From Swiss-Prot:
Reactions mediated catalytically: (1S,2R)-1-C-(indol-3-yl)glycerol 3-phosphate + L-serine = D-glyceraldehyde 3-phosphate + L-tryptophan + H2O
Cellular component per GO, a single term: cytoplasm
Entry's Gene Ontology BP terms: L-tryptophan biosynthetic process
Disulphide-bridged cysteine pairs: none
InterPro entries in UniProt: Trp_synth_b_CS, Trp_synth_beta, Trp_synth_beta/beta-like, TrpB-like_PALP, TrpB-like_PALP_sf
Subunit structure: Tetramer of two alpha and two beta chains.
Function, in words: The beta subunit is responsible for the synthesis of L-tryptophan from indole and L-serine.
Record-linked SUPFAM superfamilies: Tryptophan synthase beta subunit-like PLP-dependent enzymes
The protein's name: Tryptophan synthase beta chain 1
EC number assigned by the record: 4.2.1.20
Entry's family note: Belongs to the TrpB family.
Length: 389
């Protein structure tokens, strides 16, 4: 069925939003066939964002694990993460649709920075909604967004994190449909957003496939990526679905799955409806969306993209989780072994290397972003303070 991945996805939104989603779908279907759009998009990815990103052979990490480990270096993109791929695509689409105002939600701030960057590039007004809790955790990104000309609105309702920021952005969109384009930052939300975001991010997997064939002469045994909403994982996995490569999505295990303080929707969630989409949602016995926890602001989300729900159900991708402490260990390990400071989100994928037997295997880890934004929260974390004294 259109707009669904198996039983997941759809458009579970107020009636007032349906015309906007229909307008967006029609515009997107039009640009899918427009070669000039894709030329402009790809030129910007190359000349402005810095694609293709390298597939880097991590020599010392490989020696430690007895494997051949490659890092897909999305951290080297302009603004420091994979989010810019989608932001450029959607803001360009908004411009073609005649919109003048851009809004977005952000958790770790990376999508907010990327959207503010793209809005500045195209000369558009920009408002970013961010949970108040996240504005404290990610202060440098808040300052960046303001410098880029965006208005940052701290959201004080609910758990004051990503899901609340999305709620506020949706309220804004409903009020300003004529002028405003809502840039969703992950493969979540109502149709057609999950498909749009995945298609703007699949460049990651397409490049990876070409690069690994050049370097190894074959496809990898494993590809590992972190999963919050799931856009970096969808971007690298999509070109490898049904290729024989073992694909592993790593969720935020927080303080442990048994504690309830985590953000592992696919492992511990139930089927429900969140932000316009049918997917796996962390909810209580009454169906109320639960408060999530992760050391990483970008994975702190109580749902997950519907395509991931479908991949989980069909066994096309394996999903697991690592804890805050395991991710912090991986953050320090990559910094010390390779001189690369990873984002806390990406550190969850790196931490998974300890959980599987990869001896003699070729493994690609999607290094979705850099860790500058996380330095303060990592260095102030009691678990880390003991380890790097």
């Amino acid at each position: 069925m259109k707009g669904y991945f198996g039983p997941y996805g759809g458009q579970y939104v107020p009636e007032i939003l349906m015309p906007a989603l229909e307008e967006l779908e029609a515009a997107y279907e039009e640009i899918m066939k427009d070669e000039s759009f894709w030329k402009e998009f790809n030129d910007l990815l190359r000349d402005y964002a810095g694609r293709p990103t390298p597939l880097y052979f991590a020599r010392r990490l490989s020696e430690k694990y007895g494997a051949r480990i490659y890092l897909k270096r999305e951290d080297l993109l302009h603004t420091g993460a994979h989010k810019i791929n989608n932001a450029i695509g959607q803001v360009l689409l908004a411009k073609k649709m005649g919109k003048t105002r851009i809004i977005a939600e952000t958790g770790a701030g990376q999508h907010g920075v990327a959207t503010a960057t793209a809005a500045a590039l195209f000369g558009m007004e920009c408002v970013i909604y961010m949970g108040e809790e996240d504005t404290i955790r990610q202060k440098p990104n808040v300052e960046r967004m303001k410098l880029l000309g965006a208005k940052v609105v701290p959201v004080k309702s609910g758990s004051r994190t990503l899901k609340d920021a999305i709620n506020e952005a949706l309220r804004d969109w409903i009020t300003n449909l004529q002028t405003t384009y809502y840039v969703i930052g992950s493969v979540v939300g109502p149709h057609p957003y999950p498909i749009i975001v995945r298609n703007f991010q699949k460049v990651i997997g397409e490049e990876t496939k070409k690069q690994i064939l050049e370097k190894e002469g074959r496809l990898p045994d494993y590809i590992v990526a972190c999963v919050g909403g799931g856009s970096n994982a969808a971007g690298i996995f999509y070109p490898f679905i049904d290729s024989g490569v073992k694909l592993i999505g790593v969720e935020a295990g927080g303080e442990g799955l048994e504690t309830g303080k985590h953000a592992a929707s696919l492992l511990k969630g139930k089927i429900g409806y969140l932000h316009g989409s049918k997917t796996f949602v962390l909810q209580d016995d009454w169906g109320q969306v639960q408060v999530t926890h992760s050391v990483s602001a970008g994975l702190d989300y109580s749902g997950v993209g519907p395509e991931h729900a479908y991949w989980r159900e069909t066994g096309k991708v394996l999903y697991d989780a690592v804890t805050d402490e395991e991710a912090l260990d991986a953050f320090i390990e990559l910094s010390r072994l390779e001189g690369i400071i990873p984002a806390l989100e990406s550190s969850h994928a790196l931490a998974y290397l300890k959980k599987i037997n990869i001896k003699g295997k070729v493994v690609v880890v999607n290094l979705s972003g850099r860790g500058d934004k996380d330095l303060e929260s990592v260095l102030n974390h009691p678990y880390v303070r003991e380890r790097i004294r």
